[in-house]
């Protein structure tokens, strides 16, 4: 099948209906059939099960339980240098660099706006214009829990409705404004080096996006942007330490980080197309 046909079919496919159906099937307990699908998936995508807390495919009652499997203790040591921002996920670097004139690079020849990504909030986007961004793609074989790259306090969460195109490299190179048109959950944190956004982007067959404080954010979905504000002090403040889990995808997708101007410099290991490993150096706090 040609690349053009693959992209064209995505425009025609009822992506929300397909994704919700996949989500229901992935959460169903189907005994031997579930186990057979999990074993096929492990073989098809070369999933490294030796790192899982429970490496036995037959131990998972649903496909979703397998997909968001925990890793064994110590499988992903978190860099303990207080000036190092660590990778939030096992993934692959799609794009990274400066947010120039409010624009982020999606792929060669494609840009999109920080304001659109953040749900149309111009005031929020202004906090990141002139800063840095990084887009990390989680493939089907990756560990699909997302962690905190640094110590932070949750300020706001925004659900942004949208489409559910695939987010693989082929689609990123061919569908304009991909990450600003797909359904997403925007998490805004305050850190010692300024504001940081961690955006969880949905995609075809991603049955749900969850956070550790709100549980399942989507589905269900709605037609309007929804915003939750959180206290920055007091008993109800939500604080994270570097390396703590903050969310998860039930099937693969993308994480986008935005940083304020003059707050960080990316680690020299950062290159487009290079795999990332949770807990390893992502960036450094600017001196």
Swiss-Prot record:
One Gene Ontology molecular-function label: phosphatidylserine decarboxylase activity
PTM notes: Is synthesized initially as an inactive proenzyme. Formation of the active enzyme involves a self-maturation process in which the active site pyruvoyl group is generated from an internal serine residue via an autocatalytic post-translational modification. Two non-identical subunits are generated from the proenzyme in this reaction, and the pyruvate is formed at the N-terminus of the alpha chain, which is derived from the carboxyl end of the proenzyme.
Cofactor binding remark: Binds 1 pyruvoyl group covalently per subunit.
Pyruvic acid (Ser) sites (modified residues): 253
GO BP: any one term: phosphatidylethanolamine biosynthetic process
Catalytic activity: a 1,2-diacyl-sn-glycero-3-phospho-L-serine + H(+) = a 1,2-diacyl-sn-glycero-3-phosphoethanolamine + CO2
Complex formation: Heterodimer of a large membrane-associated beta subunit and a small pyruvoyl-containing alpha subunit.
Entry-linked HAMAP family: PS_decarb_PSD_B_type1
Listed name of the protein: Phosphatidylserine decarboxylase proenzyme
């Amino acid at each position: 099948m040609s690349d053009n046909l693959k992209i064209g079919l995505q425009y025609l496919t009822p992506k929300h209906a397909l994704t919700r159906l996949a989500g229901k099937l992935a959460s169903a307990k189907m005994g031997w059939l579930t186990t057979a699908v999990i074993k096929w998936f492990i073989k098809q995508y070369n999933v490294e099960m030796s790192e899982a807390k429970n490496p036995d495919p037959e131990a998972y009652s649903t496909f979703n339980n397998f997909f968001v499997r925990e890793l064994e203790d110590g499988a992903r040591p978190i860099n303990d240098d207080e000036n190092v921002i660590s990778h939030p996920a096992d993934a692959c670097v799609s794009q990274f660099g400066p947010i120039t004139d409010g624009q982020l690079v999606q792929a060669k020849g494609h840009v999109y706006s920080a304001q659109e990504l953040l749900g149309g909030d111009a005031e929020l986007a202004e906090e990141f214009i002139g800063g840095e961004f990084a887009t990390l793609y989680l493939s089907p074989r990756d560990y699909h829990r997302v962690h905190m790259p640094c110590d932070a306090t949750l300020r706001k969460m925004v659900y942004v409705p949208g489409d559910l195109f695939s987010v693989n490299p082929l689609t990123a190179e061919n569908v304009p404004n991909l990450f600003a048109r797909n359904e997403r959950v925007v998490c805004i944190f305050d850190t010692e080096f300024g504001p940081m956004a961690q955006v969880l982007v949905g995609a075809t067959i991603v049955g749900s996006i969850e956070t550790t404080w709100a549980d399942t954010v989507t589905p269900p979905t709605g037609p309007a942007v929804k915003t939750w504000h959180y206290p920055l002090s007091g008993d109800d403040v939500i604080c994270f330490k570097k390396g703590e889990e903050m969310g998860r995808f039930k099937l693969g997708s993308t994480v986008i980080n935005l940083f304020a101007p003059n707050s960080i410099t990316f680690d020299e290991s950062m290159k487009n197309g290079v795999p990332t490993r949770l807990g390893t150096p992502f960036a450094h706090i600017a001196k």
